[in-house]
């Protein structure tokens, strides 16, 4: 797991929390994301929660209900009032998340000058790089469920992901850091040699199922 940990640590930023207008939970297979958003709501960091996601990579094989709707149900079970939740349930990838979410918030009359962007721990850096292309005028702090890589994998296995599938998704998202920057989907981020070597080792071991 050493190479997986190297990728995880590179992608995870661990920024300090700040007050925001709304927390935005980005859809995926990780059901700890709405729990983190609920925690931030109850701690008073943001008075509204927006969940963004239809069905996309991985979840289209797991669920029939949209990521946003599934996350909202989890947040409400954790005590977030329904009238404090905004849903964007049409997006199928990160770019659409970032294009559709500001429109949904504006339509709901929710100010979104400052947000807490909540994603998987290993998506924080990629989300930041994408946000600068698709939602550049928003001030954002990046957060995620406070879990280790092993705990993240264990939770993912509970909802139908496989251990290999999670590791492949981590590998695929690291690949997209460079690939998507070349395509203009996110700003470039320098990738250290240690991260490149860990990525290459995992690809050589067969973790290729989520490569673009």
Region locations from a protein language model:
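A structural signal for short, hydrophobic/glycine-enriched beta-strand patches
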Residues: 1-166
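A conserved mid-domain beta-alpha-beta active-site/ligand-binding segment of alpha/beta enzyme cores
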Residues: 156-212
């Amino acid at each position: 797991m050493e190479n997986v940990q190297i990728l995880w640590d590179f992608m995870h930023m661990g920024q300090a929390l700040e007050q925001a207008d709304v927390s935005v939970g980005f859809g995926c297979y990780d059901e700890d994301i709405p729990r983190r958003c609920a925690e931030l709501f109850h701690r008073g960091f943001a008075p509204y929660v927006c969940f963004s996601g239809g069905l996309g990579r991985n979840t289209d094989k797991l669920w029939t209900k949209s990521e946003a709707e599934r996350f909202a149900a989890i947040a409400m079970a954790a005590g977030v009032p329904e009238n404090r939740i905004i849903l964007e349930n049409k997006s199928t990838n990160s770019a659409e998340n970032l294009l559709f979410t500001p429109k949904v918030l504006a339509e709901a009359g929710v100010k979104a000058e400052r947000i807490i962007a909540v994603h998987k721990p290993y998506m924080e850096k990629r989300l930041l790089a994408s946000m600068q292309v698709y939602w550049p005028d928003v001030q954002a702090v990046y957060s995620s469920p406070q879990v280790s890589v092993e705990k993240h994998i264990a939770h993912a296995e509970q909802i139908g992901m496989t251990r290999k599938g999670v590791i492949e998704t981590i590998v695929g998202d690291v690949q997209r850091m460079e690939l998507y920057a070349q395509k203009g989907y996110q700003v470039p981020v320098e990738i250290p040699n240690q991260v490149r070597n860990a990525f290459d080792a995992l690809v050589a071991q067969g973790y290729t199922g989520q490569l673009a």
